[in-house]
Structures are given as structure tokens and as C-alpha cells.
Amino acid sequence: MKMRFLFLLLAFSVQLTAQETRPPYWNDIQAFKKQDSTAFPGTGKILFVGSSSFTKWKDVQEYFPNHPIVNRGFGGSTLLDVTRYESDVIFPYQPKQVVIYCGENDIANDSSVTGKIVFERFKHLFTDIRSKLPRVPVVYISMKPSPSRWHMRSRVTEGNNRIKKFLKKKRNTVFVSVWKDMLGADGEPAKELFVEDRLHMNANGYAIWQRLLEPYLLK
């Protein structure tokens, strides 16, 4: 009886340790997998992947009714997170186009992360996508100017500029800048585009993204 108790205790301990060492957003990814197991969205669509600006865009398909979209934004993910889960949130869908919004959280989560580091992380993800999906167009939406993160703007703009310069030299890519269109007359983020947390957008903010992004989406 004592040995059995010790065995159960050890098994429970191992299970707890495994749960504690799971990478960030593991549960989000498992939720996608479960969803796909019962209702796989299909292949050959436009894939939106990235952080919470996509996660919270629940009605994205309504903004782009003529473009079939699979939204795989998750949590407050970073570029490292998207790269970690690329085999789960990108490649299974064999998309005809990939739209990425990510990088803001890399900067917000770590004061040592520079715009150059964000660019290097993006380049890693981009290289992975190109190696598996060489003919698939890639769209990157610039990191937005958020009121709550305005003090980080120098790092954000550096990252945007480096990514823009990099993509200019790559075929089948588009850099969609939302920066200027989200600024008010005072040159700061237009508060009316954001919800109370001053980070995530409301319908007015998403309407700007719709206008800037739609010309580049495949039918």
C-alpha cells in the first residue's frame, strides 16, 4: 500500500511539473487543435496569425466578406511564440496568403528588446514560412501606435522600419503601415480608436485596418 501511494505521489508530481513547464499559450494552441479536429476550416484560405489585435478581431470575416479567412491570433503572443507554434497555427492550413500582426508584445514584455531584435525575430519567422511555403505571399501589418505603449514608440518605429526595409527586397511581400492613419492631429495615438485599456482597438480602429489592408488581400 505504501509503495502504491508513493508511486501515485510521484506520478502526480511529474504531471504537475509537466504542466508547469509548458510553454506560453499552450492551452490556446490545444484549443485550436480541438476546434480543428471537429471543424477543420480547410486549406487555401488567407491566414491571419499573430497577437491579440487578431485574437480580438472575432468578426474579421465580416470586414472582408470577399476573402476567405482563417484567424489564428492567440493571446498576447510574441514573434517567438508564433515561431514556436508555426507547425500548429500556420502550416496545417496551407494558406494562399499569410497576414502577420506581431511584435508589439516582444517590446512591451522586455525592456531590453530593441527594434533590431524584433526584426531578427520576424526574419526568423519569415524564413521559416518561406522555406515551407515558398510561393505564398506574406503581408506584415506594422506595429500600431498604442496610447498605453506610446513611451515605447522609438523601439516600435525602429522595428517597423527594419521590417519594411527587409520586405522591400523580398518577392510576394507587402508591408502595410497603419502608423500614420492611427495618429490624431496632435501626432499622438488617436484615443477614439481604442477601448478602455488604451491598447486594443475598437471598431473604429479595425475599420482603418480594413481600409488599408483590403487592397492587398487575395480573392
PLM region spans:
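Generic structural signal for well-ordered alpha-helices
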Residues: 86, 122-127, 160
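Conserved beta-strand elements of the Class I
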Residues: 47-49, 70
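Catalytic His-Asp segment of secreted/periplasmic serine-dependent ester chemistry enzymes
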Residues: 145-219
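A short helix->loop->beta-strand "cap" motif at the edges of active sites that frequently abuts
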Residues: 133-137
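Extracellular glycan-modifying ectodomains
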Residues: 123, 127-128, 132, 145-148
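Oxyanion-hole/transition-state-stabilizing segment in secreted/luminal serine hydrolases
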Residues: 54-63, 68-70, 81-119, 139, ...
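N-terminal secretory targeting modules
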Residues: 1-47, 54, 62-63, 219
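Short amphipathic alpha-helices and their capping/turn segments at secondary-structure boundaries
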Residues: 36-46, 84-92, 128-130
